[in-house]
Regions:
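N-terminal glycine-rich anion-binding loops that anchor highly charged ligand groups
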Residues: 11-15, 41, 47, 52-60
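C-terminal active-site-proximal or functional interface alpha/beta core segments in diverse enzymes
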Residues: 189-267
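Glycine-rich, proline-tolerant flexible connector loops at the mouths of alpha/beta enzymes
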Residues: 23-29, 56-65, 225
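A short small-residue
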Residues: 18-23, 179-184, 218
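Alpha-helical packing segments of well-folded alpha/beta enzyme cores
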Residues: 35-38, 42, 201
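Active-site-proximal beta-alpha core segment in soluble small-molecule metabolic enzymes
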Residues: 51-214, 236-239
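Short, surface-exposed alpha-helical recognition segments that flank or form part
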Residues: 26, 30-34, 189-192
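Generic N-terminal amphipathic, Lys/Arg-enriched alpha-helix
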Residues: 2, 10-29
């Protein structure tokens, strides 16, 4: 049997007593109080560390709640043209776009919607970088830290054979157009895996700090789970900002909506 990732949910919470007959089926039901509490935690981390937190639309894109979300977060990250359009229309703030590959027919529109565009490889920077720069977007490169913290190999972006990001060992010089780096190698995890990953890549970051203006640590950080070490996170983000002289970003989806909603359905 294929191995599955365990749920991180803390239980039914307020939904334990929710009358499912009150709503149509199927539908998503959101606890707005719980959602706001999550957003307040994330905003506090941002304020304390100086890091900008973006909503990962691929994880939570209920745009009816965009007015609430954009009150607390700095923008959104998109994985393609339609998410970039959604971000522009409803969320405002900064828009970061990343995809393992971009379609040439869509790229102009994506570039004009985005503040940051993250490419998966130096080859993609060479192909689309000038186009992105002409549109006014800052250019980033996704790196593969080559440091695995994933519990399930098939979901691990650092697993052998992964094509998500450029392996650090293959990079001797960053493309000239690149002003920032992006990584995403965690999934619904605590602070310790992030700390170990940063420790693994920090020599590379220090070696290229003169070229870097920003660092995006991606998602997979379950910051709103009660046992997450938020003090440790703030210290780490602050240290990276100060020692590298960069703006630090996080892209969060599950942390935003963690234990704040249910899907009602029937068989």
């Amino acid at each position: 049997m294929s191995q599955l990732m365990p749920t991180q949910s803390q239980g039914a919470g307020n939904f334990a007593t929710f009358d499912l007959s009150r709503v149509p089926s199927p539908c998503f039901v959101v606890d707005e109080v719980a959602l706001r509490q999550n957003l307040e935690i994330l905003h506090a981390v941002s304020q304390a560390s100086g890091a900008e937190i973006l909503l990962a639309l691929k994880a939570f894109s209920m745009w009816s709640l965009a007015p609430l979300v954009r009150t607390y977060l700095s923008g959104a990250c998109a994985s393609g043209l339609w998410e970039a359009k959604l971000a522009k229309a409803h969320y405002g703030g900064q828009i970061t776009s990343y995809a393992p590959a971009f379609k040439a027919s869509e790229f102009d529109e994506i570039a004009n919607l985005s503040d940051h565009i993250v490419f998966n490889s130096p080859a993609q920077v060479a192909r689309f970088g000038a186009q992105a720069q002409q549109a006014g977007a800052a250019i980033g490169l996704r790196i593969n830290p080559q440091h695995s913290e994933g519990g399930v190999e098939k979901y691990d972006p650092c697993a052998a054979g992964s094509r998500l990001g450029q392996p650090l060992s293959d990079i001797t010089k960053l493309p000239d157009l690149v002003s920032g780096l992006h990584m995403h190698s965690l999934c619904e995890q605590g602070f310790a895996p992030l700390a170990r990953t940063v420790e693994a890549i920090e020599p590379f970051l220090q070696a290229h700090k003169q070229q870097l203006q920003w660092l995006n640590l991606g998602g997979g950080h379950l910051i709103t789970r009660p046992d997450y070490d938020r003090d440790g996170l703030v210290q780490l983000l602050t240290r990276l900002r100060d020692t590298l002289d960069v703006q630090v970003y996080l892209e969060l989806g599950t942390s935003v909506a963690f234990d704040a909603g249910i899907l009602v359905g029937e068989i």
